[in-house]
Amino acid sequence: MLSLEEGYGIQLAPNSISILNKIGFRNIDKNHFFNPLKLNFYSNNNKICDLDLGKFNNDSIKYTTLQRSTLIEFLKDKLFTNNFRFGKEVRKVSKIQDKLLINFSDNTNDLVDFIIVSDGVFSKTKSIIESKDIKPRYNGSVAIRSVIKFSEEFNYESKNISLIMLPNAHIVIYPINKKGYFNLVCIVREKLSQNYDINSIIKKKILSKNKNLENLFKADLNLWPVYVSKKPIKSIHDNVFYLGDAFYTFVPALAQGASQSIEAAYELFNLLYENKKNIQNLYFTKRLKRIKQINKRSKFNYFGFHISNPLLMNLRNFILKRFVINKNFIQSYLGKIYK
């Protein structure tokens, strides 16, 4: 069995792979990642159509799926682990002329030129720096995750991504390595609760719609409420930058969370390296434009994946069949994001 401590899967589109390749990503062990060929769309148990992911690839930059731990270990090796100090908690940040003084909870201090905050959707550091309580918004859904092993009971194409659309839910399955392991994430509309019953949710919201999906949920399962950002925030300090989910967390329907973190980090690196003036405004303006572009598509996908009205489901399926083969639409809708 695969230990869940090794991490669930992530999808990296070509827009982030092109950046990672600059620090040697193409040289990692080929058994530790996968390059899916297609995205298969299913309405309940019936395959509707597929999207050729090769449209966004070239010989060295390909749509990639892998475990989070594989990416984290690669980045730690490439970004000088010995220069990082882990387990630090920011207690206070003060401006001293053009620098920032960080007071940590262990009573140590650091005087720095810049602070880059990337501590997730529930960023405590952001609230401390901005001197106000900044909270995300519950999205009205939960994410159920698992890592599953290929077996004869696996009814989906092992070399591709499968997107199964159900009333008020969707499931995504994809290979995370070449050892026969797959990431499963199920997004289900559900009221916020202090005590979720995973098996009850699966039975009522998934298996009641499609009993054939039962085999997907036999491994260890974990559940998280899905939170999204209310709006991006520009810091009160010119030399503080927010990155990843600390900057903005999307609705989980476009698989761009990790890719946008990488993309934003590269943008910020270039601005700092080139010693640009007014860096914060340049960074925030470009990120805000990108966020709006992706957020609009994510929300639209989320709505489309969860349609429950039978007539609208048929219409969605009809449109999907035509859109996936329309080169102009694919380039406009996904090409601008993935390339």
Which residue stretches match the model-derived regions?
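C-terminal auxiliary extensions adjacent to catalytic cores
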Residues: 317-339
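Conserved FAD/dinucleotide-binding core of flavoprotein oxidoreductases
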Residues: 49-72, 152-223
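Conserved N-terminal helical subregion
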Residues: 13-129, 134-147, 189-199
